[in-house]
Amino acid sequence: MSDILTKIEAYKREEIAAAKRARPLAELAAAAKTASPPRGFVAAIREKLAGGDTALIAEIKKASPSKGLIRADFDPPALAKAYQQGGAACLSVLTDTPSFQGSLDYLVAARAAVTLPVLRKDFMFDTYQVVEARAHGADCILIIMAALDDAAAQDIEDAAIALGMDVLIEIHNRDELERALKLRSPMIGVNNRNLRSFEVTLATSEALAPLIPADRLMVGESGIFAPADIARLERVGIATFLVGESLMRQHDVAAATRTLLARDSLRTTGTR
């Protein structure tokens, strides 16, 4: 595990312990049962792809450890609506506070504003967090293979599936891919950001995509700023993308989303 993930795990473990004291699992599980039913995250992506469209998971992110504050004018419901109007298939909402200035309240507010399925984007170390995600309306959770051993990843995935949620399994090297393929969830996200150095290169997706079985749903993550980046990854078979920072920095988020997804000559020549 990288140094940054070690630090993150330390504070997340403290957060989880405090959350369990404040709201016991039994109470949280009861809330999860009465939450709005899950919206199919994978199903929404597959519907876009079946129509010949690129599937975008549009991210609501206020800040990041590497870039600091990304968007000062931060209104999750308005951003969610803009992404939906721009053609996104799903949303991703950062809920980690120390590193990303995120909040579960942002997820609740964003989901209430739209009909799109929503991913809780956070560092998951305990099945309590999965129940917490569902209780707040999340339709999908994230498993970062670099942060978990196989047993923990399996437990978290099992908890999510039991609650009717989808799972995005994130990898950034071949070893993590091999471990991810032991899990049941079809969605494999290739993070182009090195979690140790924070360096971003699309070559990561280009190297790993050919190794991912055809029955899995590939997602390109990080380093996607323009239609040319999407076209580059489409050439190795990736048609679903998670994009946050480049869209969050735009004044007109809906227009920027439409532009990113625009099917111009650059993307339609030899890219599919």
Curated annotation (Swiss-Prot):
GO terms for molecular function: indole-3-glycerol-phosphate synthase activity; phosphoribosylanthranilate isomerase activity. It holds the Pfam family IGPS. NCBIfam families: PRK00278.1-2, PRK00278.1-6, PRK00278.2-4. Pathway: Amino-acid biosynthesis; L-tryptophan biosynthesis; L-tryptophan from chorismate: step 4/5. GO terms for biological process: L-tryptophan biosynthetic process. Keywords: Amino-acid biosynthesis, Aromatic amino acid biosynthesis, Decarboxylase, Lyase, Tryptophan biosynthesis. The gene is trpC. This is Indole-3-glycerol phosphate synthase. It catalyses: 1-(2-carboxyphenylamino)-1-deoxy-D-ribulose 5-phosphate + H(+) = (1S,2R)-1-C-(indol-3-yl)glycerol 3-phosphate + CO2 + H2O. SUPFAM superfamilies: Ribulose-phoshate binding barrel. InterPro entries: Aldolase_TIM, Indole-3-glycerol_P_synth, Indole-3-glycerol_P_synth_dom, Indole-3-GlycerolPSynthase_CS, RibuloseP-bd_barrel. It comes from Rhodopseudomonas palustris (strain BisB18). Its EC number is 4.1.1.48.
